[in-house]
Amino acid sequence: MVCDKCEKKLGTVITPDTWKSGARNTTESGGRKLNENKALTSKTARFNPYGKNKFAICRICKSSVHQPGSHYCQGCAYKKGICAMCGKKVLETKNYKQTSV
């Protein structure tokens, strides 16, 4: 669960956009080049487990968080009804019986 403000911080997928005017993968806007493999050319986006961008641990259950920039795992964020990135209350869970299985 991610709030509207943190949804902008999420990463983008490697696949190109479908063609439309103003798309970010067109060559005239300085975007993606033709015949370029983004998976091979983007070394900065590649995950390095020993580097500075390693994944954090959940503040509640201390398990590994598999989303860069998040402080809570998806299970704990769902159970508590909070945003996984900032911890803001997203869902009122007073009358719910939440389980993460």
From Swiss-Prot:
<dbReference type="GO" id="GO:0030425">
    <property type="term" value="C:dendrite"/>
</dbReference>
<dbReference type="GO" id="GO:0030165">
    <property type="term" value="F:PDZ domain binding"/>
</dbReference>
<comment type="function">
    <text>As a component of the minor spliceosome, involved in the splicing of U12-type introns in pre-mRNAs.</text>
</comment>
<dbReference type="GO" id="GO:0005681">
    <property type="term" value="C:spliceosomal complex"/>
</dbReference>
<dbReference type="InterPro" id="IPR019367">
    <property type="entry name" value="PDZ-binding_CRIPT"/>
</dbReference>
<dbReference type="GO" id="GO:0005737">
    <property type="term" value="C:cytoplasm"/>
</dbReference>
<dbReference type="Pfam" id="PF10235">
    <property type="entry name" value="Cript"/>
</dbReference>
<dbReference type="GO" id="GO:0031122">
    <property type="term" value="P:cytoplasmic microtubule organization"/>
</dbReference>
<keyword id="KW-0508">mRNA splicing</keyword>
<comment type="similarity">
    <text>Belongs to the CRIPT family.</text>
</comment>
<keyword id="KW-0963">Cytoplasm</keyword>
<dbReference type="GO" id="GO:0008017">
    <property type="term" value="F:microtubule binding"/>
</dbReference>
<protein>
    <recommendedName>
        <fullName>Cysteine-rich PDZ-binding protein</fullName>
    </recommendedName>
</protein>
<comment type="subunit">
    <text>Component of the minor spliceosome, which splices U12-type introns.</text>
</comment>
<dbReference type="GO" id="GO:0008380">
    <property type="term" value="P:RNA splicing"/>
</dbReference>
<keyword id="KW-0747">Spliceosome</keyword>
<keyword id="KW-0507">mRNA processing</keyword>
<dbReference type="GO" id="GO:0006397">
    <property type="term" value="P:mRNA processing"/>
</dbReference>
